[in-house]
Amino acid sequence: MPFLHGFRRIIFEYQPLVDAILGSLGIQDPERQESLDRPSYVASEESRILVLTELLERKAHSPFYQEGVSNALLKMAELGLTRAADVLLRHGANLNFEDPVTYYTALHIAVLRNQPDMVELLVHHGADINRRDRIHESSPLDLASEEPERLPCLQRLLDLGADVNAADKHGKTALLHALASSDGVQIHNTENIRLLLEGGADVKATTKDGDTVFTCIIFLLGETVGGDKEEAQMINRFCFQVTRLLLAHGADPSECPAHESLTHICLKSFKLHFPLLRFLLESGAAYNCSLHGASCWSGFHIIFERLCSHPGCTEDESHTDLLRKAETVLDLMVTNSQKLQLPENFDIHPVGSLAEKIQALHFSLRQLESYPPPLKHLCRVAIRLYLQPWPVDVKVKALPLPDRLKWYLLSEHSGSMEDDI
């Protein structure tokens, strides 16, 4: 066949053997997996395996034999036929054989088709559980992390010892794959992310481009601005759930650079992202840069800058709401701080009808900073820190203390954040 070149000619040479193998198993159309679930097929599986074994023994010395059985292994991986795959492997199928088009191995294909039993079989036969494909540099764990439907394969790979923190040439780990593949509307990889974190995924993983575990969340929060209201609610709920998981496993939302800091982003738009910001502060997130302090960026400066940039008028409900939420955020900062860290040159120049209230807020913070914190405040902060992680207020209410002490331990503006989300 001189008109066929390269891998096309090779495929042409071994395709008859592949067809014969599929035919021996009663598979006419490999794309129709549902036909393999018929009771009649299951009942006759033993006889089909015998036919397959006889075929392989008869064709063992034919040209392109290994290529043919190895290609057939890809089909078995796709369909989840573990017994047939085991026979092919015992008769010379190559675990490292790549699909001529996608360059995926049988293990990659088994993951893509969510065949956890096939994954286990291939690994037990010696397949490299951390092998990356040549095109996308994806490991089986990367592929399993990208779709919620592949959760069974993700669990099986972790149980079999896949390296949860292996990264591709760009520095992207399975956790970052799971986050980047989530859109908060149609794809919710929350359980995938939970499994990876429980399996030891590093929350400090960073790509060569500087993407962190919070990059996806920050991007999705930006998508809620001016978008469909129902979709925005779904995205906010997803971001809250994932942020809660990340913080529970030690992620720091207040690290610089500012554009990669979830706390900084929520502070900049505290009216829009108020429930999530309240959760971050209740969970003990720093309101200044956690690496360099207020000299890098300060939550107090951001809040007052936003207030002063919105003059408003007395009957302006949006500005009144903005001021109310600013008071809540400031109260949470004070409630969770042993000593306030106000930025240097922290001067403001508010204008408009609410300028006096803004100035009064600023003055009260200056007063708090200028005096040593009282013992009762230090005790309040220490107890709240001890009761973390969130929800602190639920734990405070369960303490065997008089109601008056509970009231003092509670933040003045506490509420049900999950309901708000």
From Swiss-Prot:
Coiled coil: none annotated. Its main location: cytoplasm. Keywords: ANK repeat, Cytoplasm, Repeat, Ubl conjugation pathway. Pathway: Protein modification; protein ubiquitination. Pfam families: Ank_2, Ank_4, SOCS_box. The keyword Cell division does not apply. GO terms for cellular component: cytoplasm. SMART domains: ANK (SM00248), SOCS (SM00253), SOCS_box (SM00969). SUPFAM superfamilies: Ankyrin repeat, SOCS box-like. The keyword Glycoprotein does not apply. It is found in: Cytoplasm. PANTHER family: ANKYRIN REPEAT AND SOCS BOX PROTEIN 6. Binds APS. Identified in a complex with ELOB and ELOC. Interacts with CUL5 and RNF7. Interacts with SQSTM1. Probable substrate-recognition component of a SCF-like ECS (Elongin-Cullin-SOCS-box protein) E3 ubiquitin-protein ligase complex which mediates the ubiquitination and subsequent proteasomal degradation of target proteins. May play a role in the regulation of cell proliferation and autophagy by promoting the ubiquitination and degradation of SQSTM1. Belongs to the ankyrin SOCS box (ASB) family. This is Ankyrin repeat and SOCS box protein 6. The lineage of its organism: Eukaryota, Metazoa, Chordata, Craniata, Vertebrata.
